[in-house]
A protein has these predicted regions:
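S-adenosylmethionine-dependent methyltransferases
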Residues: 1-120
């Protein structure tokens, strides 16, 4: 939202995560919309940004589902080192940290960023 997006929708199954998004938006002085159900959202997004969905193999079908709601998807993940998907390309490896510091092992501070685009 701070980068100029017309609309930003924060979506998570966990109501506590949504509350965290609300608090973060307030701290940053931006307005967001919120959703607890990704699949109830229409196909209208230019970009879907997700993090930490690869840790559970049951989430892998979401990778294709993201492209049913948005033109592009960015996936950030620090857990899975051998991720491969025909639509997703690894853009790079980034250093990250959680704030406040949750004392995560250093290996989880390396985040891989993947990109996919809906076929035209």
């Amino acid at each position: 939202a701070k980068a100029g997006a017309t609309e930003v929708v924060a979506c998570d199954l966990d109501p506590l995560a949504i509350e965290s998004c609300r608090a973060n938006a307030a701290l940053n002085g931006v307005e967001l919309s919120y959703s607890l159900d990704f699949f109830s959202e229409e196909d209208r997004f230019d970009l879907i940004i997700v993090a930490d969905v690869l840790y559970d193999r049951a989430n892998l079908p979401l990778l294709d589902a993201f492209l049913t709601r948005g033109q592009e998807a960015l996936v950030a993940d620090s857990r899975v080192k051998d991720f491969q998907h025909p639509r997703y390309t690894r853009l790079g490896l980034l250093e990250a940290c959680t704030w406040p510091d949750l004392a995560e092992p250093a290996e989880f501070r390396e985040v891989s960023l993947y990109h996919a685009q809906r076929p035209t």
